[in-house]
């Protein structure tokens, strides 16, 4: 198609160019100079097309190029970007003049239409509240406008999110222990640099604080000093400011997961660049300092290139701060970037198409690939570092042979890539909004009589998001942050008692989310203060659901009020009219908002709160919903037992306004009502869940020395991961004896009775199976209320087995009948037989199974090993005659630590072997923590095969003491007593070596003779990591 121009100098500009073949954004604009536009929009001047509508199908603005649509007087203009070959400057200038002169009226009409649309949208949208908002500080460059991702989001129903975006170089932070941090940000207004100050309630960090020569870690320190919560946590952000430090933590993951489970690239660290000359493996990659985006990274082909690079690095800066790392060069096929944003995962494959060995530089092909379970597990492990990270990433290089190498990890400052950047930013905004909903809470000072809600943790300023002036509020001590009349401290609403990032902070109860009436009662106000000061474990979803279910009329009224009120004075004047309609209606009925939601008076439980009653989330100032018998708890805690909660809630909550002990949290002491059990026997933990921690940087399970605080509301809460002792630490030759040469022989049949406590001497044997059926239901004679792991019994192979039944009451080696009392004092008769066989009695030639979790193979104790135990009296005929070394009594311990305590009275416990006492001392009985004692050999010798002194130094390091807890065990009460026996449990655990001491210790069965000593000689804590 050829078109002619009315202007002669442009007649040859658009030859062979079809405007309809161009994309909509590049289609040319046609001028109409001889026909002025008519006001009101004639057919040749309709409104502009809707966004995304093709230009050919759009209503005409006298600018269309469709055939038959151009008026006779219209002169087509050339397309943009196509210039005449003879005079490009002239044709471009004339084109701009024609376009500017032609589109003036169309621009005016479009502006009027756009203004009307904006005005209508503004009328429908809620107005920004100048007093009720939280300030979000976003540290990122100016390429991304984060304010649009938070526009329209509200916290607690009627609080806006005000976004302050800046780079690290543009802000300074001054933090005070009393008033919190004050951020001063430089802004440019009309070419003039103006500084304004504000207090941030939350921080989103998307820019690396340290990159090359720029180092803004002091800003992170100031924000941390002020206790500002953030994503990611300021703790993790600071930990990521040295790449070797992060890589050292990746090495710890590799040691735990294995090289195949976590294929980390081999890397060598040099704290000083002068030491680089020692490296001899090439080709390699040198990385100097802490840089991003492939900066300060070089590929070295030989020793000469290494010398040149080392010289450059040495002369570039201070030697003490210029560390280097060298890793082997991988001839990569492509690289993979794995990112995690909350619960959203993505994986991208990036392959260079320009031959650059750095795939993040030059031109590269980027493709989103399927996230494998392996990639997901890797990035999940990364997210658990440094107290947990919501946003993190991982870089993997895939070699041409298909092998994968993890080269680096990144935090929330990684660059978003691919076509899903908008989606990723919205997901980050969702994370920030959800966290701010939990940690940003208005002060209780705004709920007092005659006061309207105002910002609590943010300084009150008179400027709007679009104000022109600058608020020069100096130190900002006069803001509403300090609450009067003994309110909460200045900044507690932002942080937990221990940290400021991921602590357990409550999302306000309904009594504090809306302003109270001036006539609200005093007890209700006090209860509201108490409830608001408590912390909650609810998530964003549970708090939102609970809040929406509590007061839908209040939320609607607050939205309507914010949409209609545009001036602060009007809000003050009409607060009583357009306030909380639900609160007014409730007060007409003689109830307050808290009474309506909880079904009772302020802070108390109604008399009708029976087993079927339910309590909403505003009852205790927590986002909990007690529905029925504790089965509707919206919490991260396990559900309480149905038989215990109905009496527990009225009992603890009847103390009016301070019912903090009625709900079990990991940092509060529980009452006995919630933690008592009908039987003190072993309760298997089937619904154990990780409790939310006050300290977000502590990823270990909750640990405490108090018996009342180590139990959750459901069951015991000591996790198995807290038992962190390591057997075989230092590679002693005694640790690995050869496998047994044959089955262990049984004790001799010529058994003589031993004068000892019949109950205690037979309790140990009765706790195991009387046959070789590998029965797992009757071999545990240990009870513990803190049991998480189990000990699996595995019988050894024997020959010539013959079972012998005996009469009850005998205290001989083949007697296995006694009365063992359980935890409730009920005497349960237990009958059984002891398996005996006639073979040689030298059990040291081949013995039992050692720990399967540590040694995975049978072990044997021979007389030629240094651990010769022939001198111990447990090898005697009497001790073997008692059946103590019977083949059916040799269990296999599948725990990472040796954690068994014995109950037989004829010999001492394992403590003498573990703690290294080989002498014979007078035995005694007692309660409490048992430390080192003396006596004869026990099963520890048989299993591990070493002398007693080695168990103290080799097996458990420098451990000197041991704590033991036995549930359902009575105190020792003399010889012949039947009240102190052990109960038989399905899954057993008694004393365990861990990095802390269990409390609530109880004594084992009583015996005056040949028991371990209860003397507290060395009461040190175990350190077995």
UniProtKB/Swiss-Prot annotation:
Tissue expression per record: Widely expressed in the embryonic and adult nervous system synaptic terminals.
Homology family: Belongs to the synapsin family.
Chain intervals with Pro residues compositional bias: 34-52, 472-492, 736-749
Quaternary data: Identified in a complex with Syt1 and nwk.
Record's function text: Plays a significant role in nervous system function, which is subtle at the cellular level but manifests itself in complex behavior.
GO molecular function, one term: ATP binding
Keyword Phosphoprotein part of the UniProt annotation: yes
Protein name per Swiss-Prot or TrEMBL: Synapsin
Coiled coil: none
Pfam families assigned: Synapsin, Synapsin_C
Biased composition (Polar residues): 651-673, 726-735, 750-759, 872-904
Phosphoserine carried by residues: 539
Low complexity: bias regions: 454-463, 499-546, 594-626, 703-725, 760-772, 995-1007
Residue ranges, annotated region (Disordered): 1-94, 439-784, 872-910, 995-1025
Localization in the cell: Synapse
GO biological process: associative learning; behavioral response to ethanol; male courtship behavior; memory; olfactory learning; optomotor response; response to heat; synapse organization
Phenotype seen when the gene is deleted: Mutants show no obvious defects in brain morphology and no striking qualitative changes in behavior are observed. Quantitative differenes are seen: mutants show faster habituation of an olfactory jump response, enhanced ethanol tolerance, and significant defects in learning and memory as measured using three different paradigms.
Keywords: Behavior, Phosphoprotein, Synapse
Other facts: Readthrough of the terminator UGA may occur between the codons for 581-Met and 583-Glu.
